[in-house]
Curated annotation (Swiss-Prot):
InterPro entries: Ribosome_biogenesis_Nop16. It is found in: Nucleus, Nucleolus. Component of the pre-66S ribosomal particle. The gene is NOP16. Its main location: nucleus. Residues 8-27 have a biased composition (Basic residues). The keyword Repeat does not apply. Belongs to the NOP16 family. This is Nucleolar protein 16. Residues 1-28, 206-236 are annotated as: Disordered. One of its GO terms (biological process) is ribosomal large subunit biogenesis. It comes from the Eukaryota.
Amino acid sequence: MGRELQKAKNKSSIPKKRQKGPSKKKILQNPIIAKHWNQKETLSQNYRRLGLTSRLNHATGGQEKTIALLGLNDPKSSRADIAAGSTANALNIVSKAPQTIDVEELEVERDPETGAILRVIGQKEETANPLNDPLNELDDDEADEWDGFAMVPEHGEQEQVNPVIRELEEAAKNGERKAPRKQSQREEEWLERLVARYGDDYGRMARDRKLNPMQQTEADIKKRVKKWQASQASQA
Protein backbone atom coordinates (compact mmCIF):
# COMPACT_ATOMS: atom_id res chain seq x y z
CA MET A 1 0.00 0.00 0.00
CA GLY A 2 1.39 3.35 -1.07
CA ARG A 3 1.67 6.52 0.90
CA GLU A 4 -1.42 8.62 1.35
CA LEU A 5 0.22 11.89 0.42
CA GLN A 6 2.06 11.48 -2.83
CA LYS A 7 4.62 14.09 -3.62
CA ALA A 8 3.70 16.03 -6.74
CA LYS A 9 6.37 15.76 -9.37
CA ASN A 10 7.82 19.14 -10.19
CA LYS A 11 8.01 19.77 -13.90
CA SER A 12 11.58 20.18 -15.01
CA SER A 13 12.51 23.45 -16.66
CA ILE A 14 14.98 21.62 -18.89
CA PRO A 15 13.29 20.70 -22.16
CA LYS A 16 13.58 17.15 -23.38
CA LYS A 17 16.04 16.71 -26.18
CA ARG A 18 14.72 14.54 -28.94
CA GLN A 19 17.13 13.11 -31.42
CA LYS A 20 16.21 13.74 -35.01
CA GLY A 21 15.95 10.82 -37.34
CA PRO A 22 18.16 10.37 -40.37
CA SER A 23 17.41 12.92 -43.04
CA LYS A 24 16.10 11.61 -46.33
CA LYS A 25 17.47 13.42 -49.33
CA LYS A 26 14.83 14.01 -51.96
CA ILE A 27 16.25 14.15 -55.45
CA LEU A 28 14.00 16.53 -57.36
CA GLN A 29 16.35 18.02 -59.94
CA ASN A 30 17.34 15.05 -62.09
CA PRO A 31 14.57 12.58 -63.06
CA ILE A 32 17.05 9.83 -63.96
CA ILE A 33 18.69 9.85 -60.53
CA ALA A 34 15.29 10.19 -58.82
CA LYS A 35 14.05 7.09 -60.65
CA HIS A 36 16.93 4.93 -59.37
CA TRP A 37 17.14 6.50 -55.89
CA ASN A 38 16.58 4.22 -52.88
CA GLN A 39 15.23 6.01 -49.81
CA LYS A 40 16.35 3.18 -47.52
CA GLU A 41 20.01 3.81 -48.35
CA THR A 42 22.22 6.69 -47.35
CA LEU A 43 23.48 9.31 -49.76
CA SER A 44 26.92 7.69 -49.98
CA GLN A 45 25.44 4.25 -50.59
CA ASN A 46 23.13 5.56 -53.32
CA TYR A 47 25.96 7.42 -55.03
CA ARG A 48 28.23 4.37 -54.90
CA ARG A 49 25.52 2.14 -56.36
CA LEU A 50 24.73 4.62 -59.14
CA GLY A 51 28.40 5.16 -59.96
CA LEU A 52 28.39 8.81 -58.86
CA THR A 53 30.33 10.81 -56.31
CA SER A 54 29.39 13.75 -54.13
CA ARG A 55 32.91 15.22 -54.15
CA LEU A 56 35.80 15.07 -56.57
CA ASN A 57 38.52 15.29 -53.92
CA HIS A 58 40.14 12.23 -52.40
CA ALA A 59 38.39 10.78 -49.34
CA THR A 60 40.20 11.72 -46.12
CA GLY A 61 38.45 9.28 -43.79
CA GLY A 62 35.14 7.85 -42.75
CA GLN A 63 34.76 5.87 -45.95
CA GLU A 64 32.88 2.62 -45.66
CA LYS A 65 35.10 -0.35 -46.50
CA THR A 66 33.29 -2.96 -48.55
CA ILE A 67 34.46 -6.16 -50.20
CA ALA A 68 33.74 -4.73 -53.63
CA LEU A 69 35.71 -1.57 -52.81
CA LEU A 70 38.75 -3.56 -51.70
CA GLY A 71 38.53 -5.83 -54.74
CA LEU A 72 38.51 -9.07 -52.73
CA ASN A 73 36.02 -10.79 -55.05
CA ASP A 74 37.66 -9.59 -58.23
CA PRO A 75 39.88 -12.36 -59.68
CA LYS A 76 41.95 -9.73 -61.49
CA SER A 77 42.66 -7.81 -58.29
CA SER A 78 46.00 -8.16 -56.52
CA ARG A 79 44.10 -8.76 -53.24
CA ALA A 80 41.81 -11.53 -54.52
CA ASP A 81 43.65 -14.19 -52.49
CA ILE A 82 43.44 -12.25 -49.19
CA ALA A 83 40.62 -13.02 -46.78
CA ALA A 84 37.87 -10.46 -46.26
CA GLY A 85 38.73 -10.05 -42.58
CA SER A 86 42.40 -9.45 -43.20
CA THR A 87 43.94 -6.35 -41.66
CA ALA A 88 46.77 -5.99 -44.15
CA ASN A 89 48.53 -2.70 -44.33
CA ALA A 90 47.12 -0.38 -46.98
CA LEU A 91 50.62 0.42 -48.20
CA ASN A 92 51.75 -3.16 -48.76
CA ILE A 93 53.49 -3.55 -52.09
CA VAL A 94 52.65 -6.65 -54.07
CA SER A 95 55.18 -8.00 -56.54
CA LYS A 96 54.45 -10.76 -59.02
CA ALA A 97 57.02 -13.55 -59.11
CA PRO A 98 57.76 -14.91 -62.58
CA GLN A 99 55.93 -18.15 -63.32
CA THR A 100 58.46 -19.34 -65.89
CA ILE A 101 62.21 -18.83 -65.98
CA ASP A 102 63.73 -17.97 -69.34
CA VAL A 103 66.72 -20.11 -70.24
CA GLU A 104 69.66 -18.04 -71.38
CA GLU A 105 73.18 -18.96 -72.42
CA LEU A 106 76.09 -16.76 -71.45
CA GLU A 107 79.81 -16.95 -71.99
CA VAL A 108 81.78 -16.64 -68.77
CA GLU A 109 85.46 -16.44 -67.95
CA ARG A 110 86.66 -18.81 -65.21
CA ASP A 111 89.79 -18.99 -63.13
CA PRO A 112 91.99 -21.78 -64.58
CA GLU A 113 93.07 -22.91 -61.13
CA THR A 114 89.91 -22.66 -58.99
CA GLY A 115 87.23 -22.66 -61.72
CA ALA A 116 85.46 -19.65 -60.16
CA ILE A 117 83.57 -17.30 -62.46
CA LEU A 118 85.54 -14.12 -62.97
CA ARG A 119 83.30 -12.20 -65.38
CA VAL A 120 80.52 -12.60 -67.92
CA ILE A 121 81.55 -12.00 -71.53
CA GLY A 122 79.23 -10.26 -73.98
CA GLN A 123 77.01 -8.53 -71.41
CA LYS A 124 75.50 -5.42 -73.02
CA GLU A 125 74.49 -3.53 -69.89
CA GLU A 126 76.54 -3.57 -66.76
CA THR A 127 74.50 -3.75 -63.56
CA ALA A 128 75.62 -2.35 -60.24
CA ASN A 129 77.74 -4.86 -58.35
CA PRO A 130 79.09 -3.27 -55.16
CA LEU A 131 79.87 -6.67 -53.56
CA ASN A 132 81.78 -8.00 -56.60
CA ASP A 133 79.36 -10.91 -56.99
CA PRO A 134 80.20 -12.84 -60.20
CA LEU A 135 76.57 -14.04 -60.51
CA ASN A 136 75.16 -10.54 -60.23
CA GLU A 137 74.59 -10.35 -64.00
CA LEU A 138 72.36 -13.44 -63.89
CA ASP A 139 69.79 -11.81 -61.59
CA ASP A 140 66.36 -11.23 -63.10
CA ASP A 141 65.00 -7.75 -62.47
CA GLU A 142 61.41 -8.67 -63.39
CA ALA A 143 60.76 -10.12 -59.93
CA ASP A 144 61.58 -6.75 -58.37
CA GLU A 145 59.20 -4.81 -60.58
CA TRP A 146 56.71 -2.67 -58.63
CA ASP A 147 53.11 -3.56 -59.42
CA GLY A 148 51.29 -0.97 -57.33
CA PHE A 149 49.63 -0.94 -53.92
CA ALA A 150 47.82 -3.99 -52.61
CA MET A 151 44.65 -2.15 -51.61
CA VAL A 152 43.98 -0.67 -55.05
CA PRO A 153 41.67 -2.94 -57.08
CA GLU A 154 42.58 -3.54 -60.69
CA HIS A 155 39.84 -3.24 -63.29
CA GLY A 156 39.84 -4.73 -66.74
CA GLU A 157 39.61 -2.81 -69.97
CA GLN A 158 36.17 -4.26 -70.78
CA GLU A 159 34.52 -3.09 -67.57
CA GLN A 160 30.76 -2.73 -67.86
CA VAL A 161 29.49 0.82 -67.64
CA ASN A 162 26.80 1.56 -65.08
CA PRO A 163 23.42 1.87 -66.86
CA VAL A 164 22.62 5.01 -64.86
CA ILE A 165 25.83 6.64 -66.10
CA ARG A 166 24.91 5.66 -69.65
CA GLU A 167 21.46 7.26 -69.28
CA LEU A 168 22.96 10.44 -67.86
CA GLU A 169 25.47 10.66 -70.70
CA GLU A 170 22.74 10.19 -73.31
CA ALA A 171 20.57 12.83 -71.61
CA ALA A 172 23.48 15.27 -71.51
CA LYS A 173 24.28 14.56 -75.15
CA ASN A 174 20.72 14.89 -76.47
CA GLY A 175 19.19 17.18 -73.86
CA GLU A 176 18.04 20.74 -74.34
CA ARG A 177 20.51 23.51 -73.72
CA LYS A 178 19.79 25.95 -70.95
CA ALA A 179 18.48 29.23 -72.30
CA PRO A 180 20.69 32.25 -71.55
CA ARG A 181 19.49 34.68 -68.92
CA LYS A 182 17.47 37.58 -70.25
CA GLN A 183 17.77 41.04 -68.77
CA SER A 184 14.71 42.28 -66.96
CA GLN A 185 12.86 45.44 -67.89
CA ARG A 186 14.13 47.31 -64.82
CA GLU A 187 17.73 46.33 -65.62
CA GLU A 188 17.34 47.57 -69.19
CA GLU A 189 15.91 50.88 -67.96
CA TRP A 190 18.80 51.24 -65.50
CA LEU A 191 21.39 50.59 -68.22
CA GLU A 192 19.63 53.02 -70.55
CA ARG A 193 19.91 55.79 -67.94
CA LEU A 194 23.61 55.05 -67.43
CA VAL A 195 24.36 55.10 -71.15
CA ALA A 196 22.29 58.26 -71.67
CA ARG A 197 24.30 60.08 -69.01
CA TYR A 198 27.86 58.74 -69.38
CA GLY A 199 27.98 57.18 -72.86
CA ASP A 200 30.79 54.59 -72.82
CA ASP A 201 32.61 55.92 -69.74
CA TYR A 202 32.17 52.85 -67.53
CA GLY A 203 34.49 54.16 -64.84
CA ARG A 204 32.19 57.11 -64.08
CA MET A 205 29.19 54.76 -64.18
CA ALA A 206 30.73 52.64 -61.44
CA ARG A 207 31.52 55.71 -59.28
CA ASP A 208 28.03 57.19 -59.51
CA ARG A 209 26.41 56.43 -56.15
CA LYS A 210 22.92 57.49 -57.19
CA LEU A 211 22.64 55.61 -60.47
CA ASN A 212 24.77 52.73 -59.18
CA PRO A 213 23.54 52.18 -55.60
CA MET A 214 24.50 48.47 -55.60
CA GLN A 215 28.12 49.42 -56.39
CA GLN A 216 28.49 47.26 -59.47
CA THR A 217 32.06 47.14 -60.74
CA GLU A 218 33.23 48.75 -63.95
CA ALA A 219 33.74 45.38 -65.66
CA ASP A 220 30.30 44.14 -64.60
CA ILE A 221 28.56 47.27 -65.91
CA LYS A 222 30.48 47.03 -69.18
CA LYS A 223 29.39 43.41 -69.65
CA ARG A 224 25.76 44.28 -68.94
CA VAL A 225 25.84 47.25 -71.31
CA LYS A 226 27.33 45.15 -74.12
CA LYS A 227 24.62 42.55 -73.64
CA TRP A 228 21.90 45.22 -73.60
CA GLN A 229 23.25 46.84 -76.76
CA ALA A 230 23.36 43.46 -78.53
CA SER A 231 19.74 42.76 -77.62
CA GLN A 232 18.71 46.23 -78.82
CA ALA A 233 20.51 45.67 -82.14
CA SER A 234 18.81 42.29 -82.67
CA GLN A 235 15.37 43.77 -82.03
CA ALA A 236 15.94 46.65 -84.46
